[in-house]
Amino acid sequence: MIGGLFIYNHKGEVLISRVYRDDIGSRQAADSAVFSSSGPFPGEWLEARNAVDAFRVNVIHARQQVRSPVTNIARTSFFHVKRSNIWLAAVTKQNVNAAMVFEFLYKMCDVMAAYFGKISEENIKNNFVLIYELLDEILDFGYPQNSETGALKTFITQQGIKSQHQTKEEQSQITSQVTGQIGWRREGIKYRRNELFLDVLESVNLLMSPQGQVLSAHVSGRVVMKSYLSGMPECKFGMNDKIVIEKQGKGTADETSKSGKQSIAIDDCTFHQCVRLSKFDSERSISFIPPDGEFELMRYRTTKDIILPFRVIPLVREVGRTKLEVKVVIKSNFKPSLLAQKIEVRIPTPLNTSGVQVICMKGKAKYKASENAIVWKIKRMAGMKESQISAEIELLPTNDKKKWARPPISMNFEVPFAPSGLKVRYLKVFEPKLNYSDHDVIKWVRYIGRSGIYETRC
Amino acid sequence: MTDSKYFTTTKKGEIFELKAELNSDKKEKKKEAVKKVIASMTVGKDVSALFPDVVNCMQTDNLELKKLVYLYLMNYAKSQPDMAIMAVNTFVKDCEDPNPLIRALAVRTMGCIRVDKITEYLCEPLRKCLKDEDPYVRKTAAVCVAKLHDINAQLVEDQGFLDTLKDLISDSNPMVVANAVAALSEIAESHPSSNLLDLNPQSINKLLTALNECTEWGQIFILDCLANYMPKDDREAQSICERVTPRLSHANSAVVLSAVKVLMKFMEMLSKDLDYYGTLLKKLAPPLVTLLSAEPELQYVALRNINLIVQKRPEILKHEMKVFFVKYNDPIYVKLEKLDIMIRLASQANIAQVLAELKEYATEVDVDFVRKAVRAIGRCAIKVEQSAERCVSTLLDLIQTKVNYVVQEAIVVIKDIFRKYPNKYESVIATLCENLDSLDEPEARAAMIWIVGEYAERIDNADELLESFLEGFHDESTQVQLQLLTAIVKLFLKKPTETQELVQQVLSLATQDSDNPDLRDRGYIYWRLLSTDPVAAKEVVLAEKPLISEETDLIEPTLLDELICYIGTLASVYHKPPSAFVEGGRGVVHKSLPPRTASSESAESPETAPTGAPPGEQPDVIPAQGDLLGDLLNLDLGPPVSGPPLATSSVQMGAVDLLGGGLDSLMGDEPEGIGGTNFVAPPTAAVPANLGAPIGSGLSDLFDLTSGVGTLSGSYVAPKAVWLPAMKAKGLEISGTFTRQVGSISMDLQLTNKALQVMTDFAIQFNRNSFGLAPAAPLQVHAPLSPNQTVEISLPLSTVGSVMKMEPLNNLQVAVKNNIDVFYFSTLYPLHILFVEDGKMDRQMFLATWKDIPNENEAQFQIRDCPLNAEAASSKLQSSNIFTVAKRNVEGQDMLYQSLKLTNGIWVLAELRIQPGNPSCTDLELSLKCRAPEVSQHVYQAYETILKN
């Protein structure tokens, strides 16, 4: 299991050091520790120091770019993740579950962020006592323990520890929650207004050939839920999943044909740990008791019948050796009543470009020499519209034989619908103990489709 | 609020000040001081001098202060064991505290203090805490047992904590179960033999129930533990799989990977015919693909594991090529791994897409990545024959870019392509030669030199090119030196007249001026060969090279199976067994996949069925010999080339005319050679007569086994024998026999797929052999060979292939290739398949020849227990093309005079003596006369085989 956890700043100085096992640190270090046990450094501390230094020297101060997130130095393995300029490193001498260690490091970042916001050197120094407390709680002898902030916040706070003034009932409530089946939610939450927000966030990825043939396209989506619900509400989420719709439609043939069109085929999905997976596996129903506040309910991936919000039609003509003519048409492909936002088209230019002249019908376009691209920005664009840009690119004559590789034209945008076609059908809330019903809950649903890597070759 | 100030105190006398503050009466001040101490400790300052003062602060109601003191204690207790005892009382008291959080804190911290004296006091509180009413305390105590075991294993056993821990597996609280499982698993690792976890269907059921209820981390512990269980049969395996599959939808990638591990392992036990098996395969692909949308570090772990899964079960992800396409902003470690998997998944179906991608990657910026992409193009060419041409042209385009490292990498892979497809793409050599000057890496230089040497006859200025390398011979790396030596020797053998000086130069450089033993040895070998027997030298140095395998970097199957058991762990990331990076005995228990249950596949014995690889009997992986030692390798693999014993040839060190004698015969060997006798060595002429003595005694054993009945229409056909057992060929079993019918020879093969995957892309090749046997047509296996399917093929053979004397004479070395690997085996063919139809000699001719052949070439044999009369024998032999020229009766014995001719024109004359009237004597006597006496033994064996069947 994890032998120790260290947090460094960008210089490689240690901000947090928590050692769980004394096997970390090389054998050499152990020898020298014995040797110096009467000296100024106590043995165990020195060993850990050794691992700490090994990572600094070999990874943080390494001249080369990081070639692997897992490094083995003298039979000691170091896992690291980086958040802005802070390094988090987990150290072990055993054959640990590597995926678990990384998941834990991410979780650790989430927990810290939930307590004090951005992970920065200053914030870490300001909260070091809190971090040690958290590390003591969520990692015991290197085994990850309950790390849900909802539960942790009941007894570890930035203001110090609550539990000393708690009643016995409160204490046992804390412990049963931390160890219980629903570790992510505490009991006794109350809201005057029961409200929930659902965001369907999708990023649509495309690679298209110059002729308009789709080489690859997929949507990766997330359903993010923000819940402000009292008690321990039982929720059931429904969407237009093809498998569910077809199953339900079996009874009435009419409905199948009607709803069949609107349903979508989901390639794969994963769920937050609150979702009962066995139920999803057997009935494909998504039921759960949500954590309080914001969390990611599910992630999914689709590859079929994707609505591509924009089509890019490029035309590049080489006029002699020193001139390029580029014409790019973009067409919006969704309901005219909807508006796309933050549209940006990036047209790469050759390295030996000396000057560019651009004319565009809509928005603003600029040649950015430092980025070797023409950047065309349009604030808003309605559906079923089309716009065009033409540019003349002057080139410096070069004797470079290497042909310009013509990188693809990329696009960014945001649209108010889900390109996968996913629709939330319902989100039912039941709280049997409290006196509010599904109808009393105010629900909000929002769809945002953003461009992922949306490229057209030219 | 701003704790960062604690980090900034660096003034002198700090310790003294802290001491005063720690002993302050004010609570707040104390707490501040302890915080300062912890901050100093964190940045690496030694604050152990404050030990007594800090421990004094322990007795407090303030939980925060208490935790800080505990943190200090954990770090320094070991250095001050005597003082640490001071803390014991507080711990023991805290373990009785009404607040469960404090009880847990005390037992958790005590376990972290690795001082023997303290551990003694720990036992009682721990025992209580293991049975605490509060689950939070119990789950903490469970982990504490593992801590204590790490300090003092004996104590844990003596105190019976292991049993208590086992009881906790049945606890009502899922988190307690999970921690108990984690603790037990770790303890069990250090006691491989003790059946600590004692997994049985009941406990497995409990674990599976807890699996649904515990935290994500607990699920990982439980799944990792489940993976160590060995279900008793396929039904149990299936039911566990069914209950584990829902985990594939978990958001935590580690849960998914651990579930994949359980499924991959238990799948081994399921029969492939089951519907469920197919369903499971289908279910595995989407979650693996989804792992690729996780954070980059996890993607890396996932990709390393997918790399293993793709090797073990290629069918899972064969349609998912696109998701492994590299994204522009992937970190380099993700890019390199994706590339690796892309090559593994490349097939005829997707090769166009893959190539287009690889071409894009070759223009990226990261040098390592670009190199790997270029190399990948070469690997595609070798793997997918149909794409070879396109790959080569892509590589040529890349060479045109003149980017130094791209050119060098391209040359290295083109060398491999030449090896794989000889005489196909040599037209590009000219382009390669243009880039000679830009090569500065040893591997590329060596590759280029290999190409120049190998194709010396097509490169007009090969001698100049090689000479240019020779100038800086001693500054080159060893691989370049070795290659240069070999290349120049090759050149010399091909163009002996112009290059004599060059070869002497390189030989003396290698043998006299070099300290490298490898180089010297190789130099001497060539030298001796060239000076004693240039013809043999030619056969050695210019011998045909073994095929290179299309799949490179494959993990050895036993290791792969072991790594599959370690999916998700560091071992799977490093692709090394834990013993390679874990110290001591911990966690190095050898794991292996479960055996397939005997009920599902009765044909295979349970020991060999599961992975096909019990230790010691694993199939040999012959990796691509992409290295440049091709010639030497061939020397090792090939038959011994006989020449005069070395003792007779004195090595003339440094003699200028060391090649004097050899050169003539060498040049004479080439038809256009100047001078020299026009002596063409017959295939067997190079073999001294003394080697013709009884050889191949194994052959008779082989035929003793055969008892089937041959067909009468053609020559005798032996029943099929197993030539290549499945175990040695990753599941491909080959058996076969040879037939001769109406003048055509064929090899009747029976291919059986005993592996778990479909086999395709079969091809066959023979090594050079004594009679030039070679496939007359490619091996045609029309449909892919599914598991457990058998196909029968008749492969027509010709006798126009390259000739090389084998030992024994009728030995045939065969290489069979399929989509998995290349396999080598050798077999002995019966000589009678080489007896041609026009082997009947005219009487006069027979007499003349009989007299003409010297008597020492006559060999006598006895064929025992063969009660045939002359007519029967004669007709039997005739059907196998042994013709009776004359028959005589002398003193009651029938004498048959017979003749036969081999495919290479060698005549064999025979006298067969039969005693028909004497039932007590059923032995036949056979005298054979032949100009090539070494065939006699085999002709005799052919006689025996034909007559006795």
UniProtKB/Swiss-Prot annotation, chain B:
SMART domains: Alpha_adaptinC2, ARM, B2-adapt-app_C. The keyword Iron does not apply. It is a peripheral membrane protein. Its main location: Golgi. The keyword Protein transport applies. It comes from the Eukaryota. Residues 584-625 are annotated as: Disordered. Residues 594-611 have a biased composition (Low complexity). InterPro entries: AP_beta, AP_complex_bsu_1_2_4, ARM-like, ARM-type_fold, Armadillo, B-adaptin_app_sub_C, Clathrin/coatomer_adapt-like_N, Clathrin_a/b/g-adaptin_app_Ig. Keywords: Acetylation, Cytoplasmic vesicle, Deafness, Disease variant, Golgi apparatus, Ichthyosis, Membrane, Nitration, Protein transport, Transport. The modification 3'-nitrotyrosine is found at Y574. One of its GO terms (cellular component) is AP-1 adaptor complex. GO terms for molecular function: clathrin binding; protein kinase binding. Pfam families: Adaptin_N, Alpha_adaptinC2, B2-adapt-app_C. The modification N6-acetyllysine is found at K318. GO terms for biological process: basolateral protein secretion; determination of left/right symmetry; heart development; intracellular protein transport; kidney development; melanosome assembly; platelet dense granule organization; vesicle-mediated transport. Widely expressed. Adaptor protein complex 1 (AP-1) is a heterotetramer composed of two large adaptins (gamma-type subunit AP1G1 and beta-type subunit AP1B1), a medium adaptin (mu-type subunit AP1M1 or AP1M2) and a small adaptin (sigma-type subunit AP1S1 or AP1S2 or AP1S3). Belongs to the adaptor complexes large subunit family. It is linked to Keratitis-ichthyosis-deafness syndrome, autosomal recessive: An autosomal recessive form of keratitis-ichthyosis-deafness syndrome, a disease characterized by the association of hyperkeratotic skin lesions with vascularizing keratitis and profound sensorineural hearing loss. KIDAR patients manifest ichthyosis, failure to thrive and developmental delay in childhood, thrombocytopenia, photophobia, and progressive hearing loss. Low plasma copper and ceruloplasmin levels have been reported in some patients. Subunit of clathrin-associated adaptor protein complex 1 that plays a role in protein sorting in the late-Golgi/trans-Golgi network (TGN) and/or endosomes. The AP complexes mediate both the recruitment of clathrin to membranes and the recognition of sorting signals within the cytosolic tails of transmembrane cargo molecules. This is AP-1 complex subunit beta-1. The gene is AP1B1.
